[in-house]
């Protein structure tokens, strides 16, 4: 796993754990890739302590020395830019084979002048334009404009990102990220096999879901601690896949979350441990639409100064004083059905490859974690299905 993928995965799991602890028993769904990408675009113009805090939260600090060496003789864009031609290539590659739309944009007030170099770097490295707006005099018009742009970029799946009254006239900058993805399963589920079945949420609570079913050859790992099954469901191009972490036996999804970190996730999903088996797959058909205001979450992770008008250092973005990040909003949509997915976001001893039954039962009738990622390990989406 390359440094960028490692950093984005670390960031993904940090955000996931914060969202989960703040939304106990609720569904979680977001796109770490677009959030990471958008914040990196902001980092281009951040300096001083503000930049140090952001680098730490984004896990760039662990390999920034290598990047500084690479960019020592370069004045065109900051060191962060060196990292992200890979992101552009990744999104371009995915877009060739799947319907993927990423919406990242910084909206800045017209009263602030922005460095031409920063604007140039955003366009060059992130294919994103900085949009100047009038928050103070045209608050409602600006809100509608942002919502319309996001709706267009996500094929109409994400609407009303900002509800009426949620954008303050005193705002100076708003960072927006949204994503839309539609992929077909390599092995589709047959609609005639979908039946009503119970989904157990714990503590005596259950609900009825539409449970999809198919038998096929899939990659599967059996983990002993915490006890779970790890199933890989590939998409039609075989470049992207959904990974489901399902607790079994007496284990719960919260136990999986406690053990979840980059090292463990790599170990659980290592191709050498994912054995091809004949599997009876039962997974619920579901759709989620989730919106998060990430200000508080990012502050809790350590990115504090950027939100404070007195402390934010965005001098790489603008010569004007008083520029700070007003709001970070992220909204994602996912629809998992028989055709595929539509989305707008230990030690080696823990792996068991012991003898398994000829056909393994994989029945997702309780809360589980799921990730959609590419062949390089970049996580496009992360989620938890806990409440139908």
UniProtKB/Swiss-Prot annotation:
Expressed in eye, lung, lymphocytes, thymus, stomach, uterus, heart, brain, liver, skeletal muscle, and in day 7, 15, and 17 embryos. Its main location: cytoplasm. GO terms for molecular function: serine-type endopeptidase inhibitor activity. It is found in: Cytoplasm. GO terms for cellular component: cytoplasm; extracellular space. Coiled coil: none annotated. Keywords: Cytoplasm, Protease inhibitor, Serine protease inhibitor. Pfam families: Serpin. The record marks 354-355 as: Reactive bond. Residues 338-362 are annotated as: RCL. Transmembrane segments: none annotated. CDD domains: serpinB11_epipin (cd19570). Inhibitor of serine proteases. Has moderate inhibitory activity for trypsin-like peptidases, but also some activity with cysteine peptidases, cathepsin L, K, and V, and the serine peptidase, tryptase gamma. Belongs to the serpin family. Ov-serpin subfamily. This is Serpin B11. It comes from Mus musculus (Mouse). The gene is Serpinb11.
């Amino acid at each position: 796993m390359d440094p960028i993928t490692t950093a984005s995965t670390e960031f993904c799991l940090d955000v996931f754990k914060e969202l989960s602890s703040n939304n106990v028993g609720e569904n979680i769904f977001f796109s770490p890739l677009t959030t990471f990408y958008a914040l990196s675009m902001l980092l281009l113009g951040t300096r001083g302590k503000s930049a140090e805090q952001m680098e730490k939260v984004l896990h760039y600090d662990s390999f920034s020395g290598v990047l500084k060496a690479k960019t020592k003789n370069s004045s065109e864009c900051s060191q962060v830019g060196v990292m992200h031609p890979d992101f552009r290539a990744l999104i371009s590659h995915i877009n060739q084979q799947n319907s993927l739309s990423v919406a990242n944009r910084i909206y800045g007030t017209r009263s602030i002048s922005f460095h031409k170099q920063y604007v140039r770097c955003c366009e060059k490295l992130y294919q994103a334009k900085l949009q100047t707006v009038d928050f103070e005099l045209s608050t409602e018009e600006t809100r509608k404009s942002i919502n319309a742009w996001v709706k267009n970029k996500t094929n109409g799946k994400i609407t009303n990102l900002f509800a009426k009254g949620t954008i303050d006239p005193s705002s100076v900058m708003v960072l927006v990220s949204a994503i839309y993805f539609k992929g077909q399963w390599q092995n589709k589920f047959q609609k005639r096999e979908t039946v009503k079945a119970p989904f157990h949420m714990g503590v005596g609570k259950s609900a009825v879901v539409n449970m999809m079913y198919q038998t096929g050859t899939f990659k599967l790992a059996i983990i002993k601690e915490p006890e779970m099954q790890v199933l890989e469901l590939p998409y039609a191009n075989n470049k992207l896949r959904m990974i489901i972490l399902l607790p079994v036996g007496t284990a719960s999804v919260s136990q999986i979350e406690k053990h979840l970190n980059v090292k463990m996730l790599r170990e659980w999903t290592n191709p050498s441990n994912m054995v091809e088996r004949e599997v009876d797959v039962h997974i619920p058909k579901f759709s989620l639409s989730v919106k998060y205001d990430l200000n508080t979450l990012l502050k809790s992770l350590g990115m504090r100064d950027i939100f404070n008008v007195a402390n934010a250092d965005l001098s790489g973005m603008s010569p004007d004083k008083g520029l700070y990040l007003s709001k970070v909003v992220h909204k994602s949509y996912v629809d998992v059905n028989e055709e595929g997915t539509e989305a707008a976001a230990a030690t080696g001893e823990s792996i068991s490859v012991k003898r398994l039954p000829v056909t393994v039962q994989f029945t997702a009738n309780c809360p589980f974690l799921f990730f959609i990622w590419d062949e390089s390990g970049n996580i496009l989406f992360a989620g938890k299905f806990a409440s139908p």
